[in-house]
């Protein structure tokens, strides 16, 4: 696969899109190790702003041949120097893939060009499903968002720090916005009560009282300490603590705090496209030095997986149901035939469940085609249920399409 990618890169200035930051680092290591005649760069959200801007400037000035990037280059990049997009796998949805493809040939009368590279057999069908949906112009539906309580709470707190608010007039203003158009006044008053003193559960504790109400029924923040805390903590995004990575005086970027659990002084890892050795660790910083030795150890980031969209899932299952694989590569035809001989192909509105013996136990495999996050939740619930029913699940594995649980029981015991 790398050789085919290399042949494309020799003819085209390219952005290679991947789905995770760890995948970007690993691909950069592999491709730069093998092909030294081309200039590559890496781009993702955990690199420092300075490094990202330098990379963008180099690509704009034709100083590099390809950037390996996550979704950090999906939006707002209008370079006419990019003639080709390569996407490793799919970004788990049609809309995002179309957006990525649109980064190429960004000039009048030009046609965007892209190559999709599946990384396994099932992902081949996912890539084909994406292409089918794009040809039919069937894009992912964007769900209507209902206004979130935490956003509304923060809005009330911020208003209280400014000129205050009166509940009835503010309610009339809020329901004019689309996300809160169905908000009931009684529920809105519960939100106000919660912001005022913690609501009916916490109103007996003074520390939760943040607002005061004057004789004109105007709510305002009750003291300067609360005002300062509110202003300093504006925002609703859950922030995972990050640790800064520095090379000398240069900040390379950030890694998740949990990376500290897997690294110690003297360990080597790859970050920002270079191999480094850890020389010092503190509570908020990992200091490193550059080394020549290549290493495949890379930081893994919390929340890095994209969710498989419903429309793409349904299109994959339609491909299996139509069962027309004559034009597919022989390896894919053999893969499908082997599945049909031993079991059956997954179908829409049905969940395929398989079990088979393995060593002293057996595997229970469930094909959900609902994405990694859904399969993670199902695995946790099913593991708990099996334990409650006297079984001994030892481990589970999962991907976007299925989950497998290894159980310390024979298949006949499970069926019984």
Would you name each region that the model predicts?
Residues 136, 148, 240, 281-351, ...:
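Terminal, basic amphipathic appendages of nucleotide-handling enzymes
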Residues 78-80, 110, 280-282, 377-378:
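Short glycine/proline-enriched turns and hinge-like loops at secondary-structure junctions
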Residues 19, 45, 72-73, 80-82, ...:
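An acidic- and aromatic-residue-enriched active-site/binding cleft used to recognize and process polar
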Residues 74-75, 83-85, 104, 262-285, ...:
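Gly/lys/ser-thr-rich phosphate-binding loops in alpha/beta enzymes
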């Amino acid at each position: 696969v790398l050789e085919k990618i290399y042949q494309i890169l020799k003819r085209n200035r390219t952005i290679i899109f991947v789905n995770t930051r760890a995948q970007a680092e690993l691909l950069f290591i592999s491709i730069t190790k093998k092909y030294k005649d081309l200039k590559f760069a890496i781009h993702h959200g955990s690199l420092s702003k300075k490094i990202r801007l330098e990379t963008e400037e180099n690509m704009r000035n034709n100083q590099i041949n390809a950037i390996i990037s996550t979704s950090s280059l999906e939006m707002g990049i209008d370079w006419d120097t990019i003639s080709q997009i390569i996407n490793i796998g799919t970004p788990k949805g049609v809309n995002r893939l179309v957006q990525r493809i649109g980064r190429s040939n960004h000039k009048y009368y030009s046609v965007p060009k892209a190559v999709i590279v599946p990384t396994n057999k099932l992902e081949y069908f996912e890539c084909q499903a994406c292409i089918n949906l794009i040809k039919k112009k069937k894009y992912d539906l964007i769900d209507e968002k209902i206004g979130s309580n935490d956003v509304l709470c923060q809005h009330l707190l911020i208003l209280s720090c400014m000129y205050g608010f009166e509940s009835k007039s503010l309610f009339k203003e809020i329901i004019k916005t689309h996300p809160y158009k169905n908000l009931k006044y009684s529920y809105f008053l519960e939100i106000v009560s919660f912001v005022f003193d913690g609501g009916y559960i916490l109103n007996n504790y003074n520390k939760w009282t943040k607002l005061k109400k004057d004789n004109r029924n105007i709510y305002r923040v009750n003291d300067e300490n609360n005002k300062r805390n509110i202003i300093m903590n504006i925002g609703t995004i859950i922030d995972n603590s990050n640790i800064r990575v520095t090379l000398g005086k240069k900040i390379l970027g950030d890694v998740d705090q949990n990376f500290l659990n897997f690294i110690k002084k003297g360990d080597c890892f790859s970050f920002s496209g270079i191999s480094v050795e850890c020389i010092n660790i503190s509570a908020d910083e990992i200091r490193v030095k550059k080394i020549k030795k290549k290493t495949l150890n890379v930081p893994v980031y919390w929340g890095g997986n994209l969710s498989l969209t419903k429309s793409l899932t349904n299109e994959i299952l339609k491909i299996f149901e139509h069962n027309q694989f004559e034009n597919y590569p022989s390896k894919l035809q053999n893969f499908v035939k082997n599945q049909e001989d031993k079991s059956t192909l997954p179908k829409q509105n049905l969940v395929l469940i398989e079990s088979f013996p393995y060593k002293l136990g057996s595997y229970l495999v469930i094909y959900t085609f609902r994405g990694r996050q859904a399969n993670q939740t199902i695995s946790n619930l099913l593991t708990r249920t099996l334990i409650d029913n006297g079984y001994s699940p030892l481990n589970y594995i999962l991907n976007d399409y299925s989950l497998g649980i290894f159980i310390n029981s024979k298949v006949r015991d499970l069926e019984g």
